[in-house]
Amino acid sequence: MSQDLEQKLWSIASGIPFVSDYFLQASPARKLKKENLFSKVFETYFLELGSGWGEVAIAMALQRRNTGFVLMEKKFDRIRHTIREIEKHSLDNVKILCVNFNWFLADVFEENLFSEILLNFPDPWPKKRHHKKRTINSKFIESLRVLLPEKGKFSFATDYGPYARKTIRLFRDSEIFKPETMEFRLERKEIPVSHFERKKRKEGKRIYYIDQILIRK
């Protein structure tokens, strides 16, 4: 990424689309730390990448009040809906970053901040010429290494088998992650079902769940 392009992207990423107490603001000058995410410090922190309509994080935040949830989402309509749900439930443990996480991720947060990171159903870019646009690659895995502590967990879901297989190979080759139990599974009960996931299940799609644990920094 050229310096000019990086500056342009940061000028976008450091802005906020509208006024809300639930926004966090990214900055190239300083990384976000646990002390300046919320009005209080939580026991653990959870990051959802591409949080969509917020239904997964909202459901988890209601059950895990001692965890701070940070959501990264770029689409304004989804962000507005999420904020309405946060307000409806009077949640003090959910904040949103209106940032494209494919631009900046490890640059935004301090190291070892999140005990868990979730990525549900990113675009699989099925055509070979588009594979370079996929989120999960060696650079992304390096960002996970920075943001997770040892024994931190990354959870991933996709309904596209070739993407699941490629993801498994990338984590295997990284040598710093290992599967939590198995390389993939076809059911997941500990994370709420999203609207997109429910739709894919109704269509009869097989969903691959991949959970990786960081074993060394």
UniProtKB/Swiss-Prot annotation:
<feature type="binding site">
    <location>
        <position position="100"/>
    </location>
    <ligand>
        <name>S-adenosyl-L-methionine</name>
    </ligand>
</feature>
<keyword id="KW-0489">Methyltransferase</keyword>
<dbReference type="InterPro" id="IPR029063">
    <property type="entry name" value="SAM-dependent_MTases_sf"/>
</dbReference>
<dbReference type="Pfam" id="PF02390">
    <property type="entry name" value="Methyltransf_4"/>
</dbReference>
<feature type="binding site">
    <location>
        <position position="159"/>
    </location>
    <ligand>
        <name>substrate</name>
    </ligand>
</feature>
<feature type="binding site">
    <location>
        <position position="123"/>
    </location>
    <ligand>
        <name>S-adenosyl-L-methionine</name>
    </ligand>
</feature>
<feature type="binding site">
    <location>
        <position position="73"/>
    </location>
    <ligand>
        <name>S-adenosyl-L-methionine</name>
    </ligand>
</feature>
<dbReference type="GO" id="GO:0008176">
    <property type="term" value="F:tRNA (guanine(46)-N7)-methyltransferase activity"/>
</dbReference>
<keyword id="KW-0949">S-adenosyl-L-methionine</keyword>
<protein>
    <recommendedName>
        <fullName>tRNA (guanine-N(7)-)-methyltransferase</fullName>
        <ecNumber>2.1.1.33</ecNumber>
    </recommendedName>
</protein>
<dbReference type="InterPro" id="IPR003358">
    <property type="entry name" value="tRNA_(Gua-N-7)_MeTrfase_Trmb"/>
</dbReference>
<dbReference type="InterPro" id="IPR055361">
    <property type="entry name" value="tRNA_methyltr_TrmB_bact"/>
</dbReference>
<keyword id="KW-0808">Transferase</keyword>
<feature type="binding site">
    <location>
        <position position="127"/>
    </location>
    <ligand>
        <name>substrate</name>
    </ligand>
</feature>
<comment type="function">
    <text>Catalyzes the formation of N(7)-methylguanine at position 46 (m7G46) in tRNA.</text>
</comment>
<feature type="active site">
    <location>
        <position position="123"/>
    </location>
</feature>
<keyword id="KW-0819">tRNA processing</keyword>
<dbReference type="GO" id="GO:0043527">
    <property type="term" value="C:tRNA methyltransferase complex"/>
</dbReference>
<comment type="pathway">
    <text>tRNA modification; N(7)-methylguanine-tRNA biosynthesis.</text>
</comment>
<comment type="similarity">
    <text>Belongs to the class I-like SAM-binding methyltransferase superfamily. TrmB family.</text>
</comment>
<feature type="binding site">
    <location>
        <position position="48"/>
    </location>
    <ligand>
        <name>S-adenosyl-L-methionine</name>
    </ligand>
</feature>
